[in-house]
Amino acid sequence: MLFATLEHILTHISFSTISIVITIHLITLLVRELGGLRDSSEKGMIATFFCITGFLVSRWASSGHFPLSNLYESLIFLSWALYILHMIPKIQNSKNDLSTITTPSTILTQGFATSGLLTEMHQSTILVPALQSQWLMMHVSMMLLSYATLLCGSLLSAALLMIRFRKNLDFFSKKKKNVLSKTFFFNEIEYFYAKRSALKSTFFPLFPNYYKYQLIERLDSWSYRVISLGFTLLTIGILCGAVWANEAWGSYWNWDPKETWAFITWTIFAIYLHSRTNPNWKGTKSAFVASIGFLIIWICYFGINLLGIGLHSYGSFTLPI
């Protein structure tokens, strides 16, 4: 009872905090002069990270196993993984382009996890025999870390495509006030302020769309780095799962729906990474491939759980009618 109460408090504190953080993040993007609020949002992200970490530790202590046995626990772990990704640029002291992706992704993931749809999964239960293995932590954690990483990389690629194919906007015309009313896309707002700041601090001639090009290049670089990491984690997760499957079911690969879609996901991002070796495919063309991968990941992770079919149907749920 004590652990259940603690988990309830921590999840609601973390969700409330991340809701405030994303509001502050949006305000600082729209009103650049309120730069002091950005530090508050980062502190809020850190506080939320510790709340989610506390939840996972509490859940682990109360259930006696690592909390990855159902969709609710996996969503909480997925949001925790997104916090980790959010912190990486801060550790490297580089521009945090990931925050535009990780912050909204976290609130959506955590919001669904704490919604009424998964209420029956909020209470920890005893693991079914097939899941009582040391491979549970290794396999599932690697898969979820790869999902979080690949989702962020795919969204960065999608952001690249949105910026690349939007009509050029004249940010310095008299219609400047209408720009923000036409779009709420964070990266374009960032682009506007980057361009305005650069005009104040540089004296060299600017060719058309130079700062738009810079933003696209930065997004492309981040997307490639994040997807490369996610692909590595996905490969490790699939290999661990194959070893575990052999121990549990006597076969390394069964072409279960989850396994099939994991293989499709791996193939899509392998194609993406291979396309990057061709200079003509860097940027827009490879970003298309990564954007397709975004949909494939959700089918693999969420769609199979929703259907509740196959050998990986543990912890699935059905929509209320």
From Swiss-Prot:
Q: Which UniProt keywords apply?
A: Chloroplast, Cytochrome c-type biogenesis, Membrane, Plastid, Thylakoid, Transmembrane, Transmembrane helix
Q: Which GO terms describe its cellular component?
A: chloroplast thylakoid membrane; plasma membrane; plastid
Quick check: keyword Disulfide bond in the entry?
Answer: no
- Tell me yes or no: is Transmembrane helix among this UniProt entry's keywords: yes
Where is this protein localized, as stated in its record? Plastid, Chloroplast thylakoid membrane
Parts of the chain that traverse the membrane: 9-29, 44-64, 68-88, 143-163, 226-246, 260-274, 289-309
Cross-referenced NCBIfam families: cytochr_II_ccsB (TIGR03144)
- UniProt family annotation: Belongs to the CcmF/CycK/Ccl1/NrfE/CcsA family.
Q: What is this protein called?
A: Cytochrome c biogenesis protein CcsA
What is the species listed in this Swiss-Prot or TrEMBL entry?
Answer: Oryza sativa (Rice)
